[in-house]
Amino acid sequence: MKKSKTHALSFYLIAILIVISCDIEKKIESPRIKSYLKIISPNSNEIIKKNDSIRINIISDSKEKSIKESTLLLNKDTFNFKNKINISTNNLLRYGRYNIKISTLFDDGSVENKSKNIFLYPDQKPKELEYELIKIITHDPETYTQGLLIDESKYLIESSGQYGKSFIKKVDMESNIIINKLMIDKKLFAEGITVYNDKLYMLTWKSNKGLILDKNTLELIGEFNYSTEGWGLTTIDDNLVMSDGTEKLFFIDPKSFKINNYIEVYDNNGKVENINEMEYINDKIYANIYGKDIIVIINYKTGEVENIINLEGLLNRENYNTNIDVMNGIAYNLENESILVTGKWWPSMFEIKIKEK
């Protein structure tokens, strides 16, 4: 028993020493390496307007060492300088966040690296356009419009949301007869739609799943996945362009479903979020903004909102006592260059033409 107690005592002593040793190690930490590179400008997350210069100013925060030379990396472009440099924004083609990386060599041979984020905004506010009302068309008030498009100038394809009630339908525009209709899995909330190579692609809201349908029959022929929410969808060349409720638009390969690229949508006041239903018209993206009776026209190469169409009052909500929700739905009629617009549970659809103010 005495020997056992001795072993136990030794064990406890060793355990105590280990705890004390660990505690000492925590207290005696490695000395923090002091940084001597100080970025005077730009400030973190500084807003730079297009056509303004990005003013770079760095200093050594030490009397013992001075800056010998510096290199700056911005948007894959490299600039050599010492303490100060002004960089034009003319070569920055897209709006939104940019990361500036600076590497500085001091006269003692040491090197320090630092970075700052800036945000590039357009310097002009969006130009407001007007519309001409061509006609008012009856719209099914049971349709919670999420996606809308005109196919072959004679069929209107529309997706409708809500869990347990989502569907997609194809309507003959001349007779207003439903040609095909497909109810969607009750676990899915239907969202935006687009056509690419005779296939119909449809997003769902929070399921990270998209559906591929036969354009003519609306038969389900495939699925695809994505990591964000699904909101609006359109097609530009060989890309599906998808919104997720943020300021970002993702350009997605319709075969591999990998993200090829993305842009951030901005106007002169900052990022434009809640981008909903979209339509590609005359080399621009026309988009609804969730909760607003407007259409914004986006330059898909830069992300700039170039124009805005105010559609407030298009639907007089005072005339209806039913559950009418927000504006959503843009479909381009190539034959007469008009646009169909509607909303979620709206009793009417409106054919309009856009014109200069």
Regions found by a protein language model. Give the residues of each.
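C-terminal motif of bacterial Sec signal peptides marking the signal peptidase cleavage site
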Residues: 18-21
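Short, compositionally biased P/S/T/A/G/V-rich stretches that sit at domain boundaries
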Residues: 23-49
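Beta-rich, blade/repeat-based domains predominating
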Residues: 141-152, 185-197, 226-237, 269-281, ...
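Conserved beta-strand positions in repeat-built beta-propeller and related beta-rich domains
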Residues: 157-162, 202-207, 242-247, 287-291, ...
